[in-house]
Amino acid sequence: MWLLGPLCLLLSSAAESQLLPGNNFTNECNIPGNFMCSNGRCIPGAWQCDGLPDCFDKSDEKECPKAKSKCGPTFFPCASGIHCIIGRFRCNGFEDCPDGSDEENCTANPLLCSTARYHCKNGLCIDKSFICDGQNNCQDNSDEESCESSQEPGSGQVFVTSENQLVYYPSITYAIIGSSVIFVLVVALLALVLHHQRKRNNLMTLPVHRLQHPVLLSRLVVLDHPHHCNVTYNVNNGIQYVASQAEQNASEVGSPPSYSEALLDQRPAWYDLPPPPYSSDTESLNQADLPPYRSRSGSANSASSQAASSLLSVEDTSHSPGQPGPQEGTAEPRDSEPSQGTEEV
């Protein structure tokens, strides 16, 4: 690609050497189809009256027949009859037509040089936005003479160089503002969704954490006044109870005393009395005072005799309640001694 530049220069120089008069190929201008400029340069005949000056003296565009304009009502036809420009570009200080016909006879039209435009000293009229923009729009530098130093080129101030750019500035501004508002709304909505999702995840993982770290019942304290305590929940340590200062003082005052303190403070009245006198007569008991010894078989016989006597007494009462039975008298002396022995034992 970098070889194309020098190659084009060589070809153009060779073509000019062939077309220029005075060289070995000066007779080529006599060939039909070529056009000789007023300065003696030869150009192809197709370049004549094409709306673009190819000769240095613009002789190829002189005495050309003007074609009928085909431009619309809002366009300005150039003098060549080939090109059309936007109507507001006429007499704006720039040659928009290739032949510069859009900047000719500008002072003759009062509408184009109205008070809304800037009148140059040479008679041209330009838009007021072109004043002090750092460019010679009036072609006599009259639009840059009365400018302040702060508005000189290179001061960082942005200037508008054409009227069509003013039309696009509001739309660009509105587009930037709308995009910024949409971006802020999207970011806020995304942040709200993320916050809601994180909160939901924390609520879902809380029961699992409680299963992994069960709460010990021994660490829980039940109080009569729960509003005097502070209960904090920690993810790592579980439930923690922090009592208030007043409750701690009350618990210290109302706590039961120790075993040794209770014995010293609450001794009975007889604790300090002297012991009773020692008597040796009480320990020696006579064998006659003791009840007779009864074996286990004897006690069983006495129990059976008592049961039999109770049955006989029931039968006697059923026959004659007022008279004792015949066997009641015989059974009573025999059972009196065993019953007495069992009761005393």
From Swiss-Prot:
Residues 295-313 have a biased composition (Low complexity). Keywords: Cell membrane, Disulfide bond, Glycoprotein, Host-virus interaction, Lipoprotein, Membrane, Receptor, Repeat, Signal, Transmembrane, Transmembrane helix. Residues 195-345 are cytoplasmic. A motif (Involved in ITCH interaction) lies at residues 256-259, 275-278. Residues 1-17 form the signal peptide. One of its GO terms (molecular function) is amyloid-beta binding. Changing D50G: Loss of infection by Venezuelan equine encephalitis virus. The gene is LDLRAD3. Residues 270-345 are annotated as: Disordered. Disulfide bonds join C29-C42, C37-C55, C49-C64, C71-C84, C78-C97, C91-C106, C113-C125, C120-C138, C132-C147. Residues 30-57 are annotated as: (Microbial infection) Interaction with Venezuelan equine encephalitis virus/VEEV spike proteins E1 and E2. It is a single-pass type I membrane protein. Gene3D superfamilies: Low-density Lipoprotein Receptor. PROSITE patterns: LDLRA_1 (PS01209), LDLRA_2 (PS50068). May influence APP processing, resulting in a decrease in sAPP-alpha production and increased amyloidogenic P3 peptide production. May regulate ITCH and NEDD4 E3 ligase activity and degradation. (Microbial infection) Acts as a receptor for Venezuelan equine encephalitis virus. Residues 18-173 are extracellular. This is Low-density lipoprotein receptor class A domain-containing protein 3.
